[in-house]
């Protein structure tokens, strides 16, 4: 079974959508094996999004991700990384298909509800960052 990292962003928590988003993963047969709610420090956010440093959206993303609580999760299941990414939909909610998490709940970028690892390497790095492995 494959594991992936998922973070529900501050807009998800603020809009009280956490349960509805988690339900989608459980309905699809995925198992939530670890979960914690936290507020990212500036340092943690910068490490988490370090690959984007220098990009035009970086500062806005860091500010947004440190603006409130997030829910960090490890999700396990068959082809978890690719399937979860498909469930999310396009990064920009306005381009996300209805029926995807971002298509149904996202408002704008970076308030697009959710992040999920895009590769096995990213999943391992992000799980280690948030859950200390």
UniProtKB/Swiss-Prot annotation:
Positions bound to ATP: 9, 57, 85, 91, 102, 112
Top class in the EC scheme: transferase
Active-site annotation: 115 (pros-phosphohistidine intermediate)
Keyword Transferase: yes
Keyword terms, alphabetized: ATP-binding, Cytoplasm, Kinase, Magnesium, Metal-binding, Nucleotide metabolism, Nucleotide-binding, Phosphoprotein, Transferase
UniProt-annotated location(s): Cytoplasm
UniProt main location, coarse: cytoplasm
GO CC list: cytoplasm
Cross-referenced Pfam families: NDK (PF00334)
GO biological process, one term: UTP biosynthetic process
Family the UniProt entry places it in: Belongs to the NDK family.
Designated name of the protein: Nucleoside diphosphate kinase
Organism: Methanococcus maripaludis (strain DSM 14266 / JCM 13030 / NBRC 101832 / S2 / LL)
Gene name per UniProt: ndk
């Amino acid at each position: 079974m494959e594991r992936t990292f998922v973070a529900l962003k501050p807009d998800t928590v603020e809009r009280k959508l956490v349960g509805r988003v988690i339900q989608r993963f459980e309905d699809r047969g995925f198992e939530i094996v670890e979960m914690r709610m936290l507020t990212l420090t500036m340092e943690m956010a910068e490490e988490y999004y370090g690959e984007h440093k220098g990009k035009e959206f970086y500062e806005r993303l860091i500010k947004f991700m440190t603006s409130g609580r997030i829910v960090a999760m490890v999700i396990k299941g068959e082809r978890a990384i690719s399937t979860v990414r498909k469930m999310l939909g396009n990064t920009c909610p306005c381009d996300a298909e209805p029926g995807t998490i971002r298509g149904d709940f996202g408002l704008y970028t970076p308030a697009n509800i959710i992040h999920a690892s895009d590769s096995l390497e990213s999943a391992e790095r992000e799980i280690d960052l948030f859950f200390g492995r």
